[in-house]
């Protein structure tokens, strides 16, 4: 069993900002999403987030979390897909740190994004453009 805390710390404090060049705002957004995931997983497992192991974040747990943020938190499919993308990015990082978790990580990577309708961009009328420019 591999503790999750050192992995997420290395991911958020070193890998994302220093190696990948993510902005502080992006790192904060990722951190918030992981806080939601860890709180959800800890509640389901009856433990504290600080005691979670990487093995606890298997595909069924991730799928349950994605359902939770859609159904109970009221997030849409695009937010769900962003959370899933951040989890997959973290799992790519973990692949190099915990080779024994490769099968589990492969199952997480196999979770598909959810299709969703994209909103059409509304164009301004000439009258609206003139009002803005004047």
Sequence positions of predicted segments:
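Onset of an N-terminal alpha helix
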Residues: 2-9, 27
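Alpha-helix boundary recognition
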Residues: 17, 133-134
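DNA breakage-rejoining catalytic core of tyrosine-based enzymes
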Residues: 115-133
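N-terminal core-binding DNA-recognition domain of tyrosine recombinases/integrases
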Residues: 10-25, 31, 35-120
């Amino acid at each position: 069993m591999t503790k999750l805390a050192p992995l997420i710390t290395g991911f958020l404090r070193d890998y994302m900002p220093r190696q990948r060049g993510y902005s502080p705002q992006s790192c904060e957004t990722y951190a918030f999403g992981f806080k939601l995931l860890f709180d959800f997983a800890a509640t389901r497992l009856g433990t504290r987030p600080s005691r979670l192991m990487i093995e606890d974040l298997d595909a069924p747990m991730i799928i349950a979390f994605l359902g939770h943020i859609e159904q109970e938190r009221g997030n849409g499919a695009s937010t769900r897909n962003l959370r899933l993308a951040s989890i997959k990015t973290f799992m790519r990082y973990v692949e190099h740190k915990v080779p024994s978790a490769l099968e589990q990580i492969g199952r997480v990577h196999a979770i598909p994004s959810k299709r969703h309708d994209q909103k059409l961009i509304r164009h301004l009328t000439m009258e609206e453009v003139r009002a803005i420019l004047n």
